[in-house]
Design a protein with these regions (language model features):
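Flexible, glycine- and charge-enriched loops at secondary-structure boundaries
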Residues: 58, 107-110, 324, 328
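Preference for the N-terminal adenyl/adenosyl cofactor-binding alpha/beta module
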Residues: 1-100, 120, 124-130, 161-171, ...
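Extended, charge-rich low-complexity interaction segments
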Residues: 179-219, 412-419
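Signature of N6-adenine DNA methyltransferases within the class I
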Residues: 63-64, 93, 100, 126-156, ...
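Post-Walker A helix-loop "phosphate-sensing" segment adjacent to the P-loop in P-loop NTPases
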Residues: 101-105
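Short acidic (Asp/Glu) and glycine-rich catalytic loops that position anionic groups and cofactors
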Residues: 18-23, 45-48, 115-118, 157, ...
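Cysteine-dependent PTP/DSP-like catalytic domain, specifically the C-terminal lobe
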Residues: 106-133
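Active-site-adjacent bridging/hinge elements
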Residues: 35-50, 106-114, 260-268, 302-317, ...
Length: 419
């Protein structure tokens, strides 16, 4: 298990005893019988309603998530899907189960299924608690029997990351065929950077292993101030000679940060900041985006976020000011931004749960057009929108406001949302 924001519990007095006691209590449950995202209730009890409102989080009922996944992912074995706002993992659960059921039907071995599902079903969220729970939900969807079978090591592909990439709207971490990850802890006048040659990111599992080993060597079994050789690591992981100087510099930076007492989760930080950037590379785009974006209203956004939201919305033909300004929310921009960044250009499909206002209200007029001007590095993002699901008549309401489900595909020519 990698170090993250929550591993402090094993470093405090009696922390290991607490973990063992908790594990015994959790073991009382029959986790083989799980048929839905059981952790969303835990998330909603840990994160206050006020905080969830500020984040625009409204959790999707499992029956709806299952129906959306069945519609959006008809061929799970050959479809790479991303939930860019995965929360506790509701959509991920049903995508994993759908993939494994198809794998069983196709006669795939357990190892083939686990390798395939972790390649084809990916999640991302901005909230570290949600990401931790979503990773557990992902494993529950796989199930204890599959996890106990003979298999290769797996890394759960659920990442802590800013899917919107607000900070990179005008810039990127990529520079001259390198990934440059800033330390960004506000403790240096000149910001240091971890540098990784682009060639090392082609294989996500190999990159994760490299970062994990660098972080482990920097934080364990090393005398203060020492910079041990890592030639064996270069050999074991087949690091090309031309990439070794950058990796050496990155390792020395990790050692310095550890010696200065500046956190010990740099490996976790690098992997999770790198993953949105990696997914945004054209060669890594997914076939389907599915999920429930944040429904954060403009009037509830912080001022600096309001300014960025307006600027990015105007550039994509989504801003409708005057009487509509306070009624706009993040969901439309989030969906368009996710399509720009992560969806393959020809035929990539989307399926998102959104407020029902998207169907006919003025603040969503630009979204319903299917043409989003100024998107990313192109003049226009064109989307052919399909007939939506209008859930306004569903009772009881499962969100504070009524909902819909929007479907569409990237296309050469836009098709407005059918009325």
């Amino acid at each position: 298990v990698e170090s993250d924001f929550f591993d402090w519990v094993v470093d405090v007095p009696k922390g290991d005893s607490f973990v063992r006691t908790l594990a015994r209590r959790i073991a009382r449950f029959d986790w083989r019988a799980v048929e839905h995202d059981v952790l969303k209730v835990l998330y909603e009890s840990v994160i206050s309603a006020e905080t969830r409102k500020k984040l625009g989080e409204y959790y999707t009922p499992d029956w709806l998530a299952q129906k959306v996944v069945e519609t959006a992912v008809p061929a799970p074995l050959t479809t790479r899907a991303l939930d860019p706002s995965c929360g506790s993992g509701t959509f991920l659960f049903h995508m994993v189960r759908r993939y494994l059921a198809a794998g069983d039907k196709a006669g795939h071995t357990m190892a083939q299924q686990l390798d395939g599902v972790t390649r084809n079903v990916v999640g991302m969220d901005l909230h570290p608690v949600a990401v931790t729970l979503a990773r557990v939900t992902y494993l529950l969807a796989i199930g204890p029997e599959r996890l106990a079978a003979e298999r290769n090591p797996i890394r759960v592909p659920v990442f802590l990351g800013d899917s919107m990439q607000w900070r990179n709207a005008r810039s990127s971490l990529w520079s001259a065929h390198e990934l440059r990850v800033p330390v960004n802890d506000q403790r240096e006048l000149t910001e240091s950077e971890f540098v990784f040659p682009q060639s090392l990111l082609a294989d996500p599992a190999a990159f994760d292993e490299l970062v994990s080993q660098l972080a482990d060597r920097a934080s364990r079994g090393r005398k203060h101030g020492a910079r041990p050789s890592h030639n064996a690591l270069f050999l074991n992981l087949a690091i090309p000679e031309d990439a070794q100087p950058a990796i050496t510099a990155t390792f020395h930076l990790m050692c310095r940060l550890h010696d200065e007492g500046r956190d010990h989760i740099w490996g976790y930080y690098i992997r999770n900041l790198a993953r949105p950037e990696w997914l945004a590379r054209p060669e890594n785009h997914v076939d389907v985006l599915v999920g429930n974006p944040p429904w954060l209203a403009f009037r509830h956004m912080p001022e600096d976020m309001q300014a960025d939201f307006r600027s990015m919305s105007e550039a994509r033909g989504l801003w409708h000011g005057k009487k509509y300004a306070t009624n706009q929310d993040l969901s439309a921009l989030f969906v368009v931004r996710a399509m720009e960044l992560y969806l393959r250009r020809e035929g990539g499909r989307v399926a998102f749960v959104m407020p029902s206002a998207v169907l006919d209200r003025g603040q969503y007029e630009g979204f319903r057009s299917g043409t989003y001007a100024g998107a990313q590095d192109q003049l226009n993002l064109q989307v052919a929108l399909d007939p939506p699901w209008d859930l306004r008549e569903v009772r009881p309401h499962f969100f504070p406001i009524s909902a819909s489900v929007v479907f569409g595909a990237r296309a050469k020519t836009a098709s407005p949302m059918p009325e």
